[in-house]
């Protein structure tokens, strides 16, 4: 029986409340006083702002709100900041209300979009609000994690529904809202409904606070002895979190029995990367690492071990928050300051409470603990003073250690102030874009009046409003000049006095806003060109968000190589530094793409909201015949391999879906198959999550996670595996061309081809030929011979060298072990010979 079956015949507030309370009681749940207060207001039709601590049951309030909306025959929307949380809530609400009554919209996927309960990202609802305004079929909006309203890049999406959906009842929820008096008055004025603020300073699990002057290892030992684990140690960089985990390996945290349980739960889990092998050591010792730069499968393993109560300590970053499912008893701050991208500053009250609020597990703990460490130099000074005892002379002789230069200090008073401070008021992040104007112009009615109202009656200060008005006028003029909109002499049948001259439906994609530009740019490429497949990749890569860490690493690598070359050429220091300013990461087709983008933007001005960014990550990887591990190693990206994988997965999805089938050459299909299989073998969870979001009726979130943990044999995808083998062989050709015998030796020492053996073979080749080709012809299929021996689980391969004379009588012979390849998730190539045929 679902909650739908409990709906009373009429939406009487008392009947609604009693029905919901009865349903909760049947599940052994007793409503907290603040939940009762919120639900009474919701069923009466009021807007409700719920500002209660983490773990206080806001999900129950949301379910009650949806229940009330359904009773009134209204469509109710639940919004969350990230797709994973939207998906999680979708399945949760399916269990409560039945799958036929719940839908999901994420930009990537649309499932049961006509359902009366819709789970979506904030941007999706904002898009609906802009497109349909007061005529939108939205009766109620439940906004979870409403503090995202103040996020610099995304906050506008939390404001637009409030401005444009006066017909809706709003339920705004967060643990860190601060002063909400502005929203209380604003919602009432706009919707005509009373607005109730439900606060509760009382946590289901109360918190205790402590400031420590002891070294961190001593603090941690005390916490473990006091049975206050699991402890989440908060760091403000990913590097610090990993370094801490390594440093804590000297502390014995788990008994032999606990270590056996950890090993049993890990089972056959595959730690495929350098960081993964380190993580394996940490977790077997009872120490987890958790940050956004990790592969999803590693984060999921840490969460799984933590949920089983097997990790004593988790070293993580301050990003712990939305969508992170890690049970914690104690939060230990290593600092109360952070670098925000511009400067080092003290934590804001909202940031502090967002992290501290994770301490204490409802249903498990009777108390949570929040501990902050004094700065290291203060700890050392306290230790020296304690050693001096009460002797005044000894205390005067203590040489106090100074803070590092430029250090931003914090103290016990800082800690106490943060504890007692309310989160800062939420700041408006309204913005004007081409998409906003086009959406408003497309809706029925007077677009000028609608835009004037939105621009003059938003949450911005007047000075900012004037700036937005000027921006809107400039955008409108560009649309008019470009022929995208036209003014009408008389209003049309739906009251428009300005209308669009183009159909926006095919041009608007929340997840890939530049995909239509890519389709136009494909037409500029020559299908007969040897570089056609890679040029298609470059077009798609230019439309993707920049992976900043990868691009910075590419630039650093390029500059390092340039400096070495200039030094070898005797270039003076000043000139070297001057030349370096012009060296950046690779940007294939830059001139062609920017020229095409400028032309395309004249007739599609809304793409101006999304700048083009040529780059070469996939192309660079493919041209160098690199595996994922080699890419991470080459650019020293071990700490951000999760970000690398996320970019590769996004590129695969874009290539797979953006490029029309009739434009996919055989080489491009090979490349796409290789990329998809590589992503799956490293960590399939990103692609599985994508497939699950697109087809939730086929696969639940839990099944998607189970699927992600089950690695398919790499040889099962024959096309992709053939490309993996080709790349593995050609990687050796590239290194041979550069005479990198040390790297070749590292790759092939186990099969008897160390650096000396490679050096001897290549000396013979270069005695005969001046050069070894690595261009498109060199990596063509004609120069790779594969003889399959399935009965022996073996392939015999021969990579022929592309010599300058075209003799093609030298090459590399190797065996590919299919069984070992499936075990490792990559092509296991064993060189057997390098020489003449």
Give residue spans per PLM region.
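Conserved two-lobed SF2 helicase motor
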Residues: 114-130, 285-296, 305-325
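Conserved segment of the helicase C-terminal RecA-like domain
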Residues: 330-333, 337-339, 345-386
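Non-catalytic terminal extensions of ATP-dependent helicases
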Residues: 288, 307-308, 391-798
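Compact beta-sheet-dominated globular domain cores
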Residues: 802-837
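Conserved interdomain hinge at the start of the Helicase C-terminal
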Residues: 212-236, 243-246, 300-308
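Conserved P-loop/Walker A NTP-binding site and adjacent catalytic elements of P-loop NTPases
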Residues: 21-24, 29-205, 212, 230-235, ...
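Helicase-associated low-complexity/disordered flanking segments
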Residues: 1-48, 255-284
């Amino acid at each position: 029986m679902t909650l739908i079956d409990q709906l009373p015949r009429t939406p009487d507030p008392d009947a609604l409340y009693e029905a919901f309370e009865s349903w909760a009681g049947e599940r052994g749940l007793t409503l907290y006083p603040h939940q009762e207060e919120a639900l009474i207001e919701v069923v009466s039709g009021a807007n409700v702002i719920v500002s209660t601590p983490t773990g206080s049951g806001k999900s129950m309030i949301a379910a009650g709100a949806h229940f009330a909306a359904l009773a009134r025959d209204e469509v109710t929307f639940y919004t969350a900041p990230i797709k994973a949380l939207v998906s999680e809530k979708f399945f949760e609400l399916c269990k409560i209300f039945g799958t036929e009554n719940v839908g999901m919209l994420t930009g990537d996927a649309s499932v049961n979009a006509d359902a009366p309960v819709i789970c979506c990202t904030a941007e999706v609802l904002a898009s609906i609000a802009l497109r349909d305004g007061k005529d939108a079929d939205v009766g109620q909006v439940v906004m979870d994690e409403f503090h995202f309203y103040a996020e610099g890049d995304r906050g506008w999406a939390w404001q637009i529904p409030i401005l444009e959906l006066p017909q809706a009842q709003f339920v705004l929820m967060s643990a860190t809202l601060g002063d909400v008096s502005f929203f209380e008055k604003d919602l009432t004025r706009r919707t005509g409904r009373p607005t109730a603020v439900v606060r509760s300073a009382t946590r289901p699990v109360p918190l205790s606070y402590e400031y420590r002057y002891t070294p961190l290892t001593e603090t941690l030992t005390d916490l473990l002895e006091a049975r206050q684990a699991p402890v989440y140690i908060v760091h403000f960089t990913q590097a610090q979190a990993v370094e801490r985990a390594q440093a804590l390996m000297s502390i014995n945290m788990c008994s032999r029995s606990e270590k056996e349980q950890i090993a049993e739960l890990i089972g056959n889990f595959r730690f495929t990367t350098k960081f993964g092998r380190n993580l394996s050591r940490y977790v077997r010792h009872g120490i987890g690492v958790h940050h956004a730069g990790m592969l999803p499968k590693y984060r999921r393993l840490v969460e799984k071990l933590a949920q089983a109560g097997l990790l004593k300590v988790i070293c993580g970053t301050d990003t712990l928050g939305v969508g992170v499912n890690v049970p914690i008893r104690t939060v230990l701050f290593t600092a109360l300051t952070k670098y925000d991208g511009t400067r080092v500053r003290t934590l804001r009250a909202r940031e502090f409470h967002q992290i501290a609020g994770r301490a204490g597990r409802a249903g498990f703990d009777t108390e949570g603990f929040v501990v902050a460490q004094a700065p290291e130099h203060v700890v050392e000074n306290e230790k020296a003073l304690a050693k001096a005892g009460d002797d005044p002379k000894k205390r005067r002789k203590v040489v106090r250690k100074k803070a590092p230069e430029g250090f931003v200090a914090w103290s016990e008073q800082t800690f106490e102030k943060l504890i007692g401070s309310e989160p800062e008021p939420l700041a408006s992040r309204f913005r004007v874009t081409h998409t906003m104007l086009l959406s408003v112009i497309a809706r029925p009615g007077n677009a000028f009046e609608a835009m004037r109202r939105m621009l003059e009656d938003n949450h911005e200060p007047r000075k900012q409003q004037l700036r937005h008005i000027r921006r809107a006028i400039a955008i409108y003029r560009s649309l008019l000049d470009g022929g995208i909109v036209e003014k009408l002499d008389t209003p049309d049948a739906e009251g428009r006095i300005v209308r669009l001259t183009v159909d926006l439906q095919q041009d608007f994609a929340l997840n890939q806003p530049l995909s239509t530009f890519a389709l136009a740019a494909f037409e500029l490429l020559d299908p007969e060109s040897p570089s056609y497949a890679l040029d298609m990749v470059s077009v798609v890569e230019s439309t993707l968000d920049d992976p900043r860490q990868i691009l910075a690493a590419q630039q650093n690598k390029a500059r390092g190589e340039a400096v070495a070359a200039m030094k070898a050429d005797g270039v003076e220091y000043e000139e070297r530094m001057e030349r370096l300013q012009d060296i950046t990461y690779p940007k294939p087709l830059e001139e062609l793409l920017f020229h095409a983008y400028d032309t395309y933007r004249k007739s599609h001005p809304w793409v101006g909201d999304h700048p083009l960014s040529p780059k070469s990550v996939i192309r660079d990887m493919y041209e160098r015949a690199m595996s994922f591990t080699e890419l991470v190693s080459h650019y020293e990206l071990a700490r951000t391999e999760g970000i690398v994988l996320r970019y590769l997965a996004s590129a695969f999805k874009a290539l797979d879906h953006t490029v029309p089938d009739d434009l996919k050459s055989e080489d491009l299909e090979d490349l796409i198959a290789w990329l998809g299989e590589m992503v799956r073998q490293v960590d399939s969870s990103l692609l599985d999550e994508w497939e699950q979001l697109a087809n939730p009726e086929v696969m639940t979130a839990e099944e998607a996670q189970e699927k992600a943990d089950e690695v398919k044999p790499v040889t099962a995808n024959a096309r992709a595996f053939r490309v993996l083998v080709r790349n593995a062989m050609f990687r050796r050709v590239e290194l041979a061309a550069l005479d990198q015998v040390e790297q070749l030796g590292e790759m092939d020492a186990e099969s008897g081809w160390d650096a000396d053996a490679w050096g001897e073979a290549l000396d013979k080749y270069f005695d005969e030929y001046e050069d070894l080709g690595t261009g498109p012809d060199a990596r063509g299929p004609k120069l790779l011979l594969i003889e399959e021996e399935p009965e022996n689980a073996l392939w015999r391969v021969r990579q022929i060298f592309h010599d300058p004379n075209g003799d093609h009588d030298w090459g590399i012979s190797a065996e590919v072990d299919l069984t070992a390849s499936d075990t490792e998730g990559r092509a296991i190539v064993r060189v057997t010979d390098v020489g003449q045929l």
